[in-house]
């Protein structure tokens, strides 16, 4: 189901995202995982763990910002 899918994870730098991202990459081989978070420092720290994986992308934003969220959702198959 998630194989070759594009997945957006809101609050992706939190505890759920830190567990979900590596497990999903390994188990389901998605086309892309977008980590959507408003915390730039946490994104920078998390990016170091996935620097060799081109499937992982980071998107700065807040779910309360409708326009930013709309841009992040472009081409997304699943939202977590």
Which stretches of residues belong to each language-model region?
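Conserved Rossmann-like nucleotide-binding pocket used by diverse enzymes
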Residues: 8, 34, 59
């Amino acid at each position: 189901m998630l194989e070759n899918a594009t997945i957006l994870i809101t609050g992706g730098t939190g505890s759920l995202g830190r567990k979900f991202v590596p497990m999903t990459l390994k188990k389901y081989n998605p086309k892309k995982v977008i980590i959507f978070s408003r915390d730039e420092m946490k994104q920078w720290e998390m990016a170091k763990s996935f620097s060799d994986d081109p499937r992982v992308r980071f998107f700065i934003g807040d779910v309360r910002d409708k326009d930013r969220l709309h841009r992040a959702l472009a081409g997304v198959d699943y939202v977590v």
